[in-house]
From Swiss-Prot:
Ranges annotated as biased composition (Low complexity): 20-29, 148-184
Major location category of this protein: nucleus
GO cellular component terms listed in the entry, alphabetical order: nucleus
Chain segments carrying region Disordered: 20-44, 143-184
Organism: Oryza sativa subsp. indica (Rice)
Subcellular location: Nucleus
DNA-binding region: 50-109
Transcription regulation recorded as keyword: yes
Keywords: Activator, DNA-binding, Nucleus, Stress response, Transcription, Transcription regulation
Record-given protein name: Dehydration-responsive element-binding protein 1J
Length: 242
């Protein structure tokens, strides 16, 4: 019985030692990390806030266009990947015009007349979907070409206007301004002299005066009837020239 009692004591002591070792190890390693919750933890919205059928793809910042197929629940048509959201929105409009015509819901109202898209209504199957995708891509490419051509023409006309030769109108220098201002009083004075001389030039006027002084005076009249009356002159002759 002593042997059995000793074995029981040894077993109890060994169990206590193992329990103490496990507790020490758990305390040293710290608490266990919490379990990660299942399911999707982070949702990032990729759809464009304004345009229909447009969403961002990847970190490169490109935009994709994907439209719902009318009359087919859950089916979508992949139109393509584009550099800007506006291009993807135009592609959406082209695809909807090809499938729905005038009743299509568009991102841009002017897409109805700016995009040249042939009408290709979707049949009972999906045979027309590749044609719709091709027509939408071609319409967007043509729209971009027309926009680039218009921008190039505008830039060319602006360059031509900036490099046009200056006008042929004379440019007056400061000296010319002084000369013109100085000549204005002279012209006015000449006009005033012309008015004073009865429309004659000054040199002709003074020449006529000198010529008049050199001419012989006319002979005196034989009678005084033309010069005096009977009471004023008394019949005496008057000499007009000395």
């Amino acid at each position: 019985m002593d042997v059995a009692r000793d074995m029981e004591k040894n077993t109890t002591a060994m169990g206590q030692l193992m329990s103490s070792s496990a507790t020490t190890a758990a305390t040293a390693t710290g608490p266990a990390s919490p379990k990660r919750p299942a399911g999707r933890t982070k949702f990032q919205e990729t759809r464009h806030p304004v345009f229909r059928g447009v969403r961002r793809r990847g970190r490169a910042g490109r935009w994709v266009c994907e439209v719902r197929v009318p009359g087919s629940r859950g089916d979508r048509l992949w139109v393509g990947t584009f550099d800007t959201a506006e291009e993807a929105a135009r592609a959406h409009d082209a695809a909807m015009l090809a499938m729905c015509g005038a009743s299509a819901s568009l991102n841009f109202t002017d897409s109805a007349w700016l995009l040249h898209v042939p009408r290709a209504p979707v049949a009972s199957g999906h045979d027309q979907l590749p044609d719709v995708q091709r027509a939408a891509s071609e319409a967007v490419a043509e729209f971009q070409r027309r926009g680039s051509t218009a921008a190039t023409a505008t830039a060319t006309s602006g360059d031509a206007a900036s490099t046009a030769p200056p006008s042929s109108s004379p440019v007056l220098s400061p000296n010319d301004d002084n000369a013109s201002s100085a000549s204005t009083p002279a012209v006015a004075a000449a006009l005033d002299h012309g008015d004073m001389f009865g429309g004659m030039r000054a040199d002709l006027y003074y020449a006529s005066l000198a010529q008049g002084l050199l001419i012989e005076p006319p002979p005196p009249p034989t009678t005084t009837e033309g010069f005096c009356d009977d009471e004023g002159c008394g019949g005496a002759e008057m000499e007009l020239w000395s």
